[in-house]
From Swiss-Prot:
Catalytic activity: tRNA(Glu) + L-glutamate + ATP = L-glutamyl-tRNA(Glu) + AMP + diphosphate
Cited function: Catalyzes the attachment of glutamate to tRNA(Glu) in a two-step reaction: glutamate is first activated by ATP to form Glu-AMP and then transferred to the acceptor end of tRNA(Glu).
Gene Ontology MF, one: ATP binding
Protein name: Glutamate--tRNA ligase
Binding positions for Zn(2+) per the UniProt entry: 117, 119, 144, 146
Composition skew (Polar residues), residue ranges: 1-13
Length: 509
C-alpha cells in the first residue's frame, strides 16, 4: 500500500463542503464532518460551503433543514455559500437541481456509460432472494444492460417506469486514493450497477454528489468512512464525464463506548440535545475536534481558530473515535471554569432564555403558582438534563417493573418516528399505545411523569414532553429504561417484533 496522500491538489483553490440530508434532527456526526471540512478549507486559505441533499422527498422537511442550519451555526460553524446565503453556484438544494441531474444522466446514456432499467421492485426482490439463497452478494445482475436500443425506446414510448443505472466493469480491481489510507483496492465484483436517476426523476446520492461537487468546484471531499465502498462508483462517474476528481479523505466514524457505531438508541446524537443540556458550543466543537485527532502540542482544550492554525489532516487516527458523554462533560466544565463570573452569568441567561420555551413553561406553571418564587420548584425539571430517579421511583400498585420497562421502550420507539413533534401527536401515540396494551390511561401515564419530570406531581406530562422537545424527551425515556435495568437481548428481540406489529396510532386519530 502507498503512503497516505498528503496532496491538497494545489493546482485548484481548496473548496470543501458539507451536504446534510434534512430528514431528522441535526446529528453530532454532521457537525464533526463539517468541522473538519471547514478547518481543512480555512487552513489552506480556501472556502467551505453547505448544500442540502433533499432528494428523499418523502422524508425531507423544511423544519429539519432549519434545525440543521441553526444547530451548525450555534456550534460555531459558518459557510460562504449555501441555501440560506446564496452564492455563485446556486441553487444549493438538490431538489431544485433536478433538471441538471437529468441532463447529466441522459449524457451518460448517450455515451453508453449508463442504461435504462425497467425491472419492477418485485423482480428485483426475487433476484436478490435467489442470490442470497445461493450464498452470493445481492447486486443487480445486469438483465437490462444489454437491451436493444429499439426495445428500450419502445418501452419508454409505452410509458413503462424505468430508472437509469450506471455501467460498471465486471472484473478487475478499482484503486481509490485516500488521504488517510493511501491506495485502497476494491474489486469491481463488489460494486453494484448503481441507480443514478429514480423513476420519479430524482437523482440518487451517487449521481447528485458527483455532479454537484464538480459544478461547485469542490477540490476535497472529507466524508465518513461509510462512503469508502461507494468511492469506485464516484470515481467511475468522474471518468465517464471526463472530470477531475476531488481528493478523497474518509474520516473515521464516531463510536459509542462499546465501539458500536454512534446511534441514538445508545447515546444522544442530536446537537440540539447537547445545546439544551447546557453544553457550551465552544466545548462541543472542541470535543468534536478531538474525535480521532490530536493537536500537534497534544492540547485537550483549544479553539476553532487554534485548530485551523495548526491543522495537519495526517494526524487523524483511523481507529474509531469514542464519543463519551462523560469526557464531553469534563471538557465543558473546563470551558465553564475559564469564564469570568460575568461571562458565566451571560452564558446561563443565554441558555435559559429561549423565549418560545419560556413562554410555554410560563403557561404550564401559571395555574399552579401563588408566588413567582414557586416557579423554581414547578419549572426546574424543564431545564435539568436527567432527573434524579432510581428503580424505586417507578413503583406502581398496578404495574410490574417489567411492564413499565416494556411500555416505556415501546413508547420510545413510537415517539422516535413521529413526523412532527407536537403535543397532539404525542397524545395520540401514547393514548393509542395504552389502549393497545389494555392499560388504563391513568396507570399508563404514571411512569412517564417519573421519567420526564422525576415526580408524579408536575405539570401535564405530554405538554412537558412537547416543551422540552424530542431530543430531551427521548433521552429521559432511555435513561428511565436503563434505570429500571433495561432489556436483555431475548426480551428486546421479542419486543421489537411486537413493536413492528403495532398500528399507526396517528392514522387512528
Amino acid at each position: 500500500m502507498m503512503q497516505p496522500s498528503t496532496s491538497t491538489n494545489s493546482n485548484r483553490p481548496v473548496r470543501t463542503r458539507i451536504a446534510p440530508s434534512p430528514t431528522g434532527f441535526p446529528h453530532v456526526g454532521t457537525a464533526y464532518i463539517a468541522l473538519f471540512n471547514l478547518a481543512f478549507a480555512k487552513a489552506h486559505g480556501g472556502e467551505f460551503i453547505l448544500r442540502i441533499e433533499d432528494t428523499d422527498q418523502t422524508r425531507s422537511t423544511e423544519q429539519s433543514e432549519k434545525m440543521i442550519l441553526d444547530a451548525l451555526r450555534w456550534v460555531g460553524l459558518d459557510w460562504s455559500e449555501g441555501p440560506d446565503v446564496g452564492g455563485p453556484h446556486a441553487p444549493y438544494r438538490q431538489s431544485e437541481r433536478s433538471a441538471i441531474y437529468k441532463k447529466h444522466a441522459e449524457q451518460l446514456i448517450d455515451s453508453d456509460h449508463a442504461f435504462r432499467c425497467f425491472c419492477t421492485s418485485e423482480e428485483l426482490d426475487t433476484m436478490r432472494a435467489e442470490q442470497m439463497a445461493n450464498g452470493e452478494t445481492p447486486r443487480y445482475d445486469g438483465r437490462c444492460a444489454h437491451l436493444a436500443t429499439e426495445k428500450t425506446e419502445q418501452l419508454v414510448k409505452e410509458g413503462k417506469p424505468n430508472v437509469i443505472r450506471m455501467r460498471v466493469p465486471t472484473e478487475g480491481v478499482c484503486q481509490v486514493q485516500d488521504m488517510l489510507r493511501g491506495t485502497v483496492e476494491i474489486p469491481w465484483t463488489q460494486v453494484d450497477m448503481q441507480v443514478l436517476l429514480k423513476t420519479d426523476g430524482m437523482p440518487t446520492y451517487h449521481l447528485a454528489n458527483v455532479v454537484d461537487d464538480h459544478l461547485m468546484d469542490i477540490s476535497h471531499v472529507l466524508r465518513g468512512e461509510e462512503w469508502l465502498n461507494s468511492a469506485p462508483k464516484h470515481q467511475l462517474l468522474y471518468e465517464y464525464f471526463g472530470w477531475e476528481m476531488p481528493v478523497l479523505c474518509h474520516m473515521p466514524l464516531l463510536r459509542n463506548p462499546d465501539k458500536s457505531k454512534l446511534s441514538k438508541r445508545k447515546n444522544p446524537t442530536s446537537i440540539t440535545y447537547y445545546r439544551d443540556a447546557g453544553v457550551l458550543p465552544e466545548a462541543l466543537l472542541n470535543y468534536l475536534g478531538r474525535m480521532g485527532y490530536s493537536m500537534p502540542d497534544e492540547a485537550e482544550k483549544f479553539t476553532l481558530d487554534e485548530m485551523i492554525a495548526s491543522l495537519d489532516i495526517q494526524r487523524v487516527s483511523l481507529g474509531g473515535p469514542i464519543f463519551d458523554i462523560e469526557k464531553l462533560n469534563w471538557l465543558n466544565a473546563e470551558w465553564l471554569r475559564a469564564l469570568t463570573p460575568e461571562e458565566l452569568k451571560n452564558k446561563i441567561l443565554d441558555w435559559a432564555s429561549n423565549s418560545d420555551k419560556l413562554t410555554a413553561i410560563a403557561a404550564a406553571i401559571q395555574p399552579r403558582i401563588e408566588l413567582l418564587s414557586d416557579a423554581v420548584n414547578w419549572s426546574g425539571f424543564y431545564f435539568q438534563n436527567l432527573p434524579d430517579i432510581n428503580a424505586e421511583s417507578f413503583t406502581h400498585k398496578s404495574l410490574t417493573a417489567e411492564q413499565i420497562i416494556e411500555m416505556l421502550q415501546l413508547a420510545l420507539w413510537q415517539l422516535e418516528t413521529l413526523p412532527t413533534w407536537s403535543e397532539e401527536n404525542i397524545y395520540a401515540t401514547l393514548k393509542g399505545l395504552a389502549a393497545h396494551l389494555d392499560i388504563k390511561m391513568r396507570d399508563f401515564m404514571a411512569p412517564f411523569f417519573i421519567a420526564i419530570a422525576g415526580s408524579t406531581s408536575s405539570t401535564p406530562v405530554m405538554n412537558s414532553m412537547a416543551i422540552i422537545g424530542a431530543d430531551m424527551t427521548l433521552t429521559r425515556l432511555r435513561h428511565a429504561v436503563d434505570v429500571l435495568g433495561g432489556l436483555g437481548k431475548k426480551k428486546l428481540k421479542k419486543l421489537e417484533k411486537q413493536a413492528a406489529e403495532l398500528p399507526d396510532f396517528l392514522a387512528a386519530e
